[in-house]
């Protein structure tokens, strides 16, 4: 049985760094002279996952009740399949979920069906179910869009070049 720190290390190595159980086993042995079987590593993953269930659910519920939330989503491939990493963040809490969809149903899962705070996002249509009076567009996204417009040819570019 591994101690709390070793189990935490296993969780980071296999979860965050995506090391296989075999590589995690080798790393523990080579760096810490800590022998651990693949089964021990699997058990540590299970124990850490179970220990994190309640805090993760608490964080998800916290997000849904906040007066101001920033949200975004970004696509990536996971084992060759298109996936989306969704983020909802407040000053103190950030929640990430990975789903195979960019649909508004995932935004509702993350923020709650009846989110009633102020939501800062890009202009992605998956958030249009939130009343526009409670949506704020992300300044960084707007600046990037303005720069792209200013780099166009024609009238838009001419106006964009003015100071």
Regions found by a protein language model. Name each.
Residues 1-163:
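Catalytic center-proximal scaffold of phosphoryl-transfer enzymes
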């Amino acid at each position: 049985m591994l101690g709390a720190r070793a189990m935490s290390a296993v969780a980071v190595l296999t979860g965050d760094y995506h090391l296989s159980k075999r590589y995690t086993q080798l790393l523990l042995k080579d760096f810490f002279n800590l022998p651990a079987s693949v089964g021990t590593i699997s058990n540590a993953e299970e124990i850490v996952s179970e220990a994190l269930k309640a805090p993760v659910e608490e964080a998800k519920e916290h997000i849904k009740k906040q007066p101001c939330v920033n949200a975004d989503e970004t696509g990536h491939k996971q084992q060759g399949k298109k996936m989306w990493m969704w983020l909802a963040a407040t000053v103190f809490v950030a929640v990430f979920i990975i789903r195979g969809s960019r649909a508004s149903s995932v935004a509702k899962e993350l923020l709650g069906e009846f989110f009633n705070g102020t939501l800062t996002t890009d202009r992605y249509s998956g958030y249009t179910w939130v009343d526009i009076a409670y949506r704020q567009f992300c300044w960084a996204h707007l600046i990037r869009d303005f720069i792209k417009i200013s780099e166009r040819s024609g009238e838009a570019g001419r106006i964009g070049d003015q100071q």
